[in-house]
């Protein structure tokens, strides 16, 4: 597959908010804090889910996948952004830009599918509790996770090849923090409408189908929870599912804004802020939401922290 055409520059210039110098330091601080929290939070979740036998369940298997994904998601872009801001170095090589684009798209699409799988897990747990162990068996969970990752990377290859093969006529100034589809399409010197239509189709498949399945799942969950007579049971069900719904709303809301409208209609600065939110801030919030709002996770932290830091059995 040819990732480079005759009009491809050797490097790109990432403009970011370079026209607003006063934003550079606050942005650097926000990115550094967010990235630190994301690393600490997601690594902690992964360790607890792996080390605590009580969390060896489908729900926490998928949560471990989500933590790995969020860790990779932010690491793909944030370190380079911090270097660009801190060293006032705005360039990225063509190969680096291609890597950014492929990995960022792949992880984003994988998260879309993984969140849908997690909502199905909650649906089975709440609405089909007697069949939960049979339906959500080890091999089914493994296949669903593998399916999410494979489809995510397959979608990335398709969208990246369509975007990168557009003629750019030497244009190399990317008005963004990193290489993303809407920003790269604006560099093209040809009519992008046919490509935008194809990208829109893939985005509908990856975004709207999973979010529709999630809404259907939570419709059934809400009906089942309202039938629970125990107030404690309702609270536990809403608590577990509420964390997932917050994550879904934050991620899908911002991703749909960016990818289900033509790049030309996206406000330049607003598009950058939305990308920062769903690409970086959401990953940080995921770890906080799942660790602080989840009773099982908090109890597991309390059990494991003494063993980790004081080597007590």
From Swiss-Prot:
Q: Which UniProt keywords apply?
A: Cell membrane, Disulfide bond, G-protein coupled receptor, Glycoprotein, Membrane, Olfaction, Receptor, Sensory transduction, Transducer, Transmembrane, Transmembrane helix
In terms of PROSITE patterns, this protein maps to:
G_PROTEIN_RECEP_F1_1, G_PROTEIN_RECEP_F1_2
Between which residues do disulfide bridges form?
97-189
So which stretches are on the Extracellular side? Answer: 1-25, 80-100, 159-195, 260-272
Q: Name one GO biological process term.
A: detection of chemical stimulus involved in sensory perception of smell
Per its UniProt record, what SUPFAM superfamilies does this chain match? Family A G protein-coupled receptor-like (SSF81321)
How is the protein disposed in the membrane? Answer: Multi-pass membrane protein
Answer yes or no on keyword Mitochondrion. Answer: no
The record's GO CC annotations read: plasma membrane
Recorded GO terms, molecular function? G protein-coupled receptor activity; olfactory receptor activity
Q: Where are the transmembrane segments?
A: 26-49, 58-79, 101-120, 140-158, 196-219, 237-259, 273-292
Q: Name its cellular compartments.
A: Cell membrane
Which residues get glycosylated? 5
| Alphabetical list of CDD domains matching this protein | 7tmA_OR2B-like (cd15947)
The record's function comment reads: Odorant receptor.
Q: What is this protein called?
A: Putative olfactory receptor 2B3
Report the source organism: Homo sapiens
